[in-house]
Amino acid sequence: MKAICFMQEVKECDLTIREQMLVCRRALRKLRWPCVLELFAQAGTEEQPLSLRPGMVELLHAAANGEADVLVVVDAAHLYCGRPELEGLLASLLHYGIHTFGAKDGNWIEPGGRRWMVLPGYDEEVWNGLR
C-alpha cells in the first residue's frame, strides 16, 4: 500500500511535529508501506476547518489522482477537529478508495467510529519508542 502522512503541528501539544513524523515513519517501516507524500499543517492552523489547513488541498488532489491507498496519521485526536469534520474527511477519502490508519494504536479510523482490528504483527512499540 502506498501511504500519505499528515501531521498537524500544535504549540501546546503532547507530540512535536518531529515526534509525530517518527511515529508515522516507524509505522510505515513496520508495515512496509512506502510513503509517497508527507504533509504538514503549521501551528496556529488547528483552529481552522480541516479543508482550509495547509496540506489538505494537496491530500485531496493526491487522493483524486490515485497516488495513495492509505492516509497515515498519529491518531484521530491529533487532527484537532470535531467528529463531524473528521467524518467528512474520512468520507471524502473513502470516495477515492483511501482508508485512514492511526499509527499510534494501529487501528483503522473509519466513519461512524467503527473500529477494525489492529493489523496483525502491529504492536505498541511504534508508539512506545518515543516515551
Predicted regions and their residues:
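Short, structured surface patches at the beginning of a domain
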Residues: 1-131
